[in-house]
A protein has these predicted regions:
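Well-ordered, non-membrane alpha-helical segments in soluble/globular domains
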Residues: 26-38, 85-103, 145-171, 197-209, ...
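Conserved beta-strand elements of beta-rich interaction domains across eukaryotes
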Residues: 16-20, 56-58, 136-137, 190-192, ...
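A domain-start/cap signature at the N-terminus of enzymes
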Residues: 1-10, 44-49, 88, 110, ...
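Short acidic, low-complexity segments enriched in Ser/Thr/Gly/Pro
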Residues: 52-115, 156-161
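Serine-dependent carboxylesterase/thioesterase catalytic core
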Residues: 101-217, 227-230
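Short, surface-exposed "cap/lid" segments of acyl-processing enzymes
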Residues: 1-69
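Structural alpha-beta junctions
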Residues: 37-51, 180, 210-220, 245-261
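C-terminal catalytic histidine-bearing segment of alpha/beta-hydrolase fold enzymes
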Residues: 221-287
Length: 287
């Protein structure tokens, strides 16, 4: 009997805009979707499932996450983050569920004609969820964090829904997803307009309140390079990052020690470049 082991966590990586024909072999290699999934697994361990998500729509090279963010311009830049309808968490759950079903079909087809079977193991603990947003992919994180702040803790925290096997491979509902999130990684995020980082104090106050009411520990990790954090032409990126960091840190004392906040700066002695913007993915410290 060949068993597909249930992961200890699902790591979901949201990509940014496309960079094609750069002529830079480092950028071309790291931006490959298969390579990205391998990097994610190398960071979190082989007992996780890695999911690399691109926008469903592109306007030229610009990623447009229209199914995840309710209000944006034609270039995929958000006008606001609003929890109504929970579009980002709902879309994420739908994507993971569809991908899992396709994976099952592929695995079952490979077993046809062989003596070994294939089963999807059941588990009594729901896997954690790690979410990573790279470059413009950080806008999806902002939307998910907003939805997290406005979501109910619910009775399913640390209480698995017995009898539903998919629950233990990927979250089946937006509540499952939001309540399973333990790590939120902003990876060199940035935009050509405001909105790269979330600066809504109300959202962070609500998240702190959730933690006090029994939600599991939550870590925010902000990873950056000079490419984004030292860009004088887009100084709002650093200003937004600094404000988000201050807002999060102001909630730490209220969270009963369950909110953890980290800021990590990479390649700080190097001049800004597009290459370092991608190399940070390989250099991520997710500990």
């Amino acid at each position: 009997m060949k068993t597909n082991i249930v992961p200890i966590a699902n790591a979901i990586f949201f990509c940014g805009d496309r960079v094609e024909g750069s002529g830079n072999p480092v950028i071309e290699r790291i931006s490959n979707l298969q390579k990205l999934s391998e990097i994610v697994v190398s960071k979190f361990g082989s007992s996780i499932n890695a999911w690399v998500i691109e926008a469903s729509v592109f306007n030229g090279p610009f990623a447009v996450y229209k199914d995840f963010i309710p209000s944006m311009n034609q270039y995929g830049e958000p006008r606001s983050y609003n929890p109504i309808g929970f579009p980002a968490s709902t879309s994420t759950v739908s994507l993971l569920s569809n991908c899992l079903e396709e994976a099952k079909k592929v695995i079952l087809r490979t077993q046809v004609g062989s003596r070994s079977g294939c089963t999807f193991a059941c588990s009594f603990s729901q896997p954690k969820t790690f979410i990573l947003g790279f470059s413009k992919g950080g806008t999806v994180l902002n939307q998910i964090v907003t939805e997290l702040g406005f979501s109910d803790i619910g009775s399913n925290v640390n209480s698995p829904n017995v009898g539903s096997e998919n629950t233990y491979i990927v979250p089946k509902t937006k509540e499952d997803l939001l309540n399973s999130i333990s790590d939120i990684h902003y990876v060199d995020v940035g935009l050509n307009t405001a909105g790269a980082y979330l600066t809504n104090h109300d959202v962070f106050e609500r998240i702190s309140k959730r933690l006090m009411q029994g939600a599991p520990q939550l870590r925010f990790l902000l990873h950056g390079t000079p490419r984004q954090w030292n860009d004088k032409r887009r100084d709002w990126i650093r200003n937004e990052k600094d404000k988000m960091l201050r807002l999060l840190e102001s909630e730490v004392p209220k969270s009963l020690g369950k909110l953890k906040v980290f800021s990590r700066y990479y390649f700080n002695n190097m001049p800004p470049s597009m290459q370092m913007h991608f190399e940070i993915i390989e250099s991520l410290d997710v500990s």
